[in-house]
């Protein structure tokens, strides 16, 4: 460490020790908590299946910042820069539309070999991979239905796509030695008030059971399902609601995905974690930032991001919660978006680990809510930034906004040529 950072580090450790926090133990734990970065920030959820295709499914990537990745080589290059600017363990989350093939591949025919380059790259960079079937931006999803479609042939197509995706996910886990979390999200819903809310959900229930019927090694693959309140063009009814997937995950013992933007604007997923964990074996979190709707803005170090991290740490959910990011902002430098959002998630986890939780819990159990509030607020002023800077320097990444210099240089030399 440099002298100034080392001095600040030593003083900060003393401050935290005075309130019973072991900084070294906190950093050891932080190094066991990977954050899964989402590949689709790098190209506005375009993928490689049809680069000229239109994004559908009730989601939008707004903006037209130059330099988005146009192929796998460019996307991996951009990711490598982002990864080099973020301390600690990371993973990469892929969608099925990021396959690589010299010839067109139907989505229900994808195979592990179409993702072999990603596995080779992940091994080189010591990353785990996660996966998602892509049930959007496709002719057979154009009318707004996939796994709950009333047409059995179309429904079967999407069932087969999800089944094939599970095999890809298991391949990732087997090759990389860490389980791949495969999340199923579908856009199915209606713009206006439906007459029959039940039948699509019955079809979805049956379809999901068929999707997960093949037994896969849990050391390689974990199933997750994700709800949503509404999407553009599906404002009145969403088949895969929170109640539907909470019941499904609890009854089938899959993981449940909670996306920060997939609920009513006054709801927060930090308040849902402790309840859900009583009924499901695992949670997948999609940390995002909804602005008035599921806008998928870049994650900030705000109250909700901190609350999400605190719930994980306070309840020792390290082995049951998988932390992923889900945002896509096309109005700013896409590499910077990755770095900002992922560093903020890491900062939130660090701050949660540096909290004197045992002391605060004892005050709560004694009913001393005055002291609980006072100390909870005072601990926010403890010098966690000095620990963060030391952690960054230990991991050979920039300690402050100097990481932006590397992004700007890359933008001038590489992105400007696209």
Swiss-Prot record:
Protein name: L-rhamnose isomerase
NCBIfam families in the record: PRK01076.1, rhaA
InterPro entries: L-rhamnose_isomerase, Rhamnose_isomerase, Xyl_isomerase-like_sf
Originating organism: Yersinia pseudotuberculosis serotype I (strain IP32953)
Cofactor binding: number and manner: Binds 1 Mn(2+) ion per subunit.
EC category name: isomerase
Classification of source organism: Bacteria, Pseudomonadati, Pseudomonadota, Gammaproteobacteria, Enterobacterales
Cofactor(s) listed in the protein's UniProt record: Mn(2+)
Keyword Cytoplasm: yes
């Amino acid at each position: 460490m440099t002298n100034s950072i080392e001095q600040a580090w030593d003083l900060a450790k003393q401050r935290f020790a005075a309130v019973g926090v072991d900084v070294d133990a906190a950093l050891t734990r932080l190094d066991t908590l990977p954050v899964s970065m989402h590949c689709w920030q790098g190209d506005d959820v375009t993928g490689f299946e049809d680069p000229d295709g239109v994004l559908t499914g009730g989601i939008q990537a707004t903006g037209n910042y130059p330099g988005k990745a146009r192929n796998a080589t460019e996307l991996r290059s951009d990711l490598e820069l982002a990864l080099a600017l973020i301390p600690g363990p990371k993973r990469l989350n892929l969608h099925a539309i990021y396959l690589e093939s010299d010839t067109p591949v139907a989505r229900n025919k994808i195979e592990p070999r179409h993702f072999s380059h990603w596995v080779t790259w992940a091994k080189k960079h010591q990353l785990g991979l996660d996966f998602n079937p892509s049930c959007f931006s496709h002719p057979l999803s154009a009318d707004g239905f996939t796994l709950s479609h009333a047409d059995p042939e179309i429904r079967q197509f999407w069932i087969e796509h999800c089944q094939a995706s599970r095999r890809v996910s298991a391949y990732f886990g087997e090759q990389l030695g860490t389980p791949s979390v495969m999340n199923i999200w579908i856009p199915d819903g209606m713009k206006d008030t439906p007459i029959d809310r039940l039948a699509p959900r019955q079809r979805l229930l049956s379809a999901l059971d068929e999707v997960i019927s093949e037994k896969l090694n849990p050391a390689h693959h974990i199933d997750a399902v994700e709800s949503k309140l509404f999407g553009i063009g599906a404002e009145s009814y969403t088949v895969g609601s929170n109640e539907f997937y909470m019941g499904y995950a609890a009854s089938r013992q899959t993981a449940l995905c909670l996306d920060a933007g997939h609920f009513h604007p006054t709801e927060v997923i930090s308040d849902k974690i402790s309840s859900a964990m009583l009924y499901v074996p695992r949670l997948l979190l999609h940390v995002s930032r909804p602005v008035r709707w599921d806008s998928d803005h870049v994650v900030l170090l705000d109250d909700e991001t901190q609350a999400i991290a605190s719930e994980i740490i306070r309840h020792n959910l390290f082995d049951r919660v998988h932390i992923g990011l889900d945002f896509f902002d096309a109005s700013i430098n896409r590499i910077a978006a990755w770095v900002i959002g992922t560093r903020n998630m890491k900062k939130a986890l660090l701050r949660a680990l540096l909290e004197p939780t045992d002391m605060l819990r004892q005050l709560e159990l004694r009913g001393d809510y005055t002291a609980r509030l006072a100390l909870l607020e005072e601990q926010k002023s403890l010098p966690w930034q000095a620990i963060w800077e030391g952690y960054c320097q230990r991991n050979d990444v920039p300690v402050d906004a100097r990481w932006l210099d590397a992004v700007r240089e890359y933008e001038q030399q590489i992105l400007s040529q696209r």
